Amino acid sequence: MRRILSAVAIVAVTAGIAACGSSSSSSPGSGSGSAAAASCSNSGIQPELFQKGQLTVATDKPVYPPWFENNNPANGQGYESAVASAIAKQLGFKPSQVKWAYEPFNASYAPGPKKFDFDINEISYTPQRATAVTFSSSYYDVQQALVALKNGPISAKHTPADLKAYIYGDQVGTTSLAFITSEIQPTAQPKVFQTLNDVKSALQTHQIDALVTDTPTAQYISSSEIPGTEMVAQFPSTGEHYGLLLAKGNPLVTCVNKAIATLKSDGTLQQLQKKYLQTYLSVPTIQP
């Protein structure tokens, strides 16, 4: 649910995706230091870990489908849980060596040291966030989508011009909130809430006309969470993508990027998207 990426930033991220070797680049997704020069095996990355002998992976709570299943990030079910498990395996960790930790979404990209190796929580790369933390290369390319009450005015009238007249709400600090302001540009300022659950409650109680979030989440909300709602449509891609979040300058990112590149080239990410996300993605797109 998390932000717009400029064409310049896309180039910067692409340039930062490197094999597991040394690098002097400071662009997002690049790495330097001992991990960049060392082997990306389990033993080679031990000096870079938050706790030696284990991979510490963070996310928020509660967690939701299709990204996680049964509110249990450690079970390997759901797209992000499965991706984290696959990356851990690429880095040489057994399931018993992976520890999940709690990190609130808004705290994850704040400056300062981190009590995890990486965070996976539908966190979009943005240049602003990248001043405080380091992002991996993309593990999922994002489109935003619109959720509204069924048979409301938005269902019938949702051209870009129509959308400016409605009242929106979203979670503080999210790229979905930024998307409302920068892309939809409604006449009224969107309402801001502390959690996604608060946003969903506002929709149910008619405090807002619609919310915006990533397409799989929007489809899940409308099909399984809030009766009487629908995903109206998704918006065209802006280049937004989700990356793993690491402490600023953490050289482990180079080996994480190598793992992601392997999962892309061998078809694993595509298979996981088909398994967990495909049913959520066949939706119409709002045309400019």
What residue spans do the PLM features occupy?
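Extended ligand-binding regions for polar small-molecule ligands
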Residues: 21, 81, 90, 152, ...
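Ligand-binding clefts/hinges and TM-proximal coupling segments of bilobed small-molecule sensing domains
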Residues: 22, 36, 40, 44-47, ...
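Extracytoplasmic small-molecule ligand-binding "clamshell" domains
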Residues: 37-119
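Periplasmic-binding protein-like
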Residues: 61, 141-148, 215-261, 279-288
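Acidic, polar ligand-binding/catalytic clefts
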Residues: 85, 96-160
